[in-house]
């Protein structure tokens, strides 16, 4: 429901850019702070929309993680290691002057505080996948 809520919020951007959205395997429940998780997902989706000119975005849950995969311009390998640094704008962000270098930095900080892990894989010209992995909750019953 949280992902669908965010998609509704950004629906006009998908329509204006002619991008597709593919949601699947999202019928899961995770233990997290909804407000802060929303901030992370919105930031990642906003980046995907900003750097995807054609094709679309796929959002799915697999291996205890939420994955946002786009068909955008991708991130250079030399930039991948630094995307979570405060104030860092990769080559594409500097080229288009659309990046403050704070969004992914803040997303990483929030994810860390929530006990989640956020990672990025990307290929220039192929797109980017951002993954938010959730800690498996262990419940003890006395």
Where are these regions (language model features)?
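Conserved glycine-rich
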Residues: 115-116
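Acidic ATP/Mg2+-coordinating residue in the GHKL
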Residues: 70
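Conserved micro-motifs of the catalytic ATP-binding
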Residues: 25, 29-33
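Short beta-strand/loop element within the Bergerat-fold HATPase_c
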Residues: 54-65
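Short conserved segment of the HATPase_c
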Residues: 75-88
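Short helix-loop "hinge" at the ATP-lid/N-box region of the Bergerat-fold HATPase_c
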Residues: 48-49
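Short alpha-helical Gxxx[C/S/T] motif in the catalytic ATP-binding
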Residues: 103, 107
